[in-house]
Amino acid sequence: MAFKDNAVELEERLVAINRVTKVVKGGRRLRFAALVVVGDRNGRVGFGTGKAQEVPEAIRKAVEDAKKNLIEVPMVGTTIPHEVLSEFGGAKVLLKPAVEGSGVAAGGAVRAVIELAGVADVTSKSLGSNTPINIVRATVEGLKQLKRAEEVAALRGISVSDLA
């Protein structure tokens, strides 16, 4: 679900900068890789990566990439509709809904994605690999898996009150 309108102001957050080298005949070629998360704090979030010889250029490319990959996050009040466990590579991320007022209990890369998505109350646990890019990808994958009660009821062909 990519959104093309740039009318909404998106907030950007730099998650990681990595210095990468390529060994060539004449020595080492140095470049920088940036990982950026963007979101409107109102249910839309995306991430992007960029690589360049200078840090600011890598960040600019990452922001451009992130704006092309926005997803819609279903929410129930200030939290997520249900618990979800998602994997990407060696990283696993568990997201659990939390009661209103409990805040975002998440670390590092997961916190950036959750906060910019606009989710105010959630508990999370990162398992396995802690590589920022894989953690961000696993978190976004988890947010994509979320479904509202109405969607689940429609898929099952029953009313929302019959779900419980």
Swiss-Prot record:
**Gene3D superfamilies linked to this entry:** 3.30.160.20, 3.30.230.10
Q: Name one GO molecular function term.
A: structural constituent of ribosome
Under SUPFAM superfamilies, the record lists: dsRNA-binding domain-like (SSF54768), Ribosomal protein S5 domain 2-like (SSF54211)
Gene from which the chain derives: rpsE
How is the quaternary structure described? Part of the 30S ribosomal subunit. Contacts proteins S4 and S8.
Q: Which domain of life is it from?
A: Bacteria
Q: Which residues form the S5 DRBM domain?
A: 10-73
Q: Which UniProt keywords apply?
A: Ribonucleoprotein, Ribosomal protein, RNA-binding, rRNA-binding
Is the Cytoplasm keyword given for this protein? no
Q: Which InterPro entries match?
A: Ribosomal_Su5_D2-typ_SF, Ribosomal_uS5, Ribosomal_uS5_bac-type, Ribosomal_uS5_C, Ribosomal_uS5_N, Ribosomal_uS5_N_CS, Ribsml_uS5_D2-typ_fold_subgr
- What is the official name of this protein in its record? Small ribosomal subunit protein uS5
GO term, biological process aspect, one: translation
- Any idea what job this protein has? With S4 and S12 plays an important role in translational accuracy. Located at the back of the 30S subunit body where it stabilizes the conformation of the head with respect to the body.
Q: What is known of its domains?
A: The N-terminal domain interacts with the head of the 30S subunit; the C-terminal domain interacts with the body and contacts protein S4. The interaction surface between S4 and S5 is involved in control of translational fidelity.
So what family is this one in? Belongs to the universal ribosomal protein uS5 family.
GO CC aspect terms: small ribosomal subunit
Give yes or no: UniProt keyword Ubl conjugation.
Answer: no
